[in-house]
């Protein structure tokens, strides 16, 4: 068995959308501060974290993209959503700033030699992190799903899909439409994944990516992991 870490590190001022709160990490306590109790010395180091619920590798709750009363918050989502069978589709040939079409997904599924099943997690490897991490294009240049290709995934009955980018659709209308497809067809998505190249050609595997139990949360950072039975 091999575990593949699919989460990127959360760090101070990491890149993200201006519509989400920035990540601010500062030192709160250091080992320079020594306390004593009954002649016994002790020190501790701690950090202060301020960030939005969409920081880093995260999963969206329906409340994020569904304004209707009763849309689930992250703490209300079933844990089974985040512990599933999974597949990875290779879309690394797609140019930056391009649309992912239905045909792209069909061809990638065929090339993977697997069939997407209901409740699956579908991970979409676009080789975006390697190509754009650390550049201004990280927040603008990613390939993205369209309303039509997201609908194709949703009609497969999947539980969620995941991308390396900070958004599932291209910036602007396409991104809004993909979010609303998730709303209308009852599934969700993850953003900010890494190391998806290690899953290409691996067939079916176990995905684990539990969110924090944030009351009324619209999303949550996750530690996403693929479990490969080598």
Segments predicted by a language model, with ranges:
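Active-/binding-site microenvironments in catalytic and ligand-binding cores
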Residues: 1-230
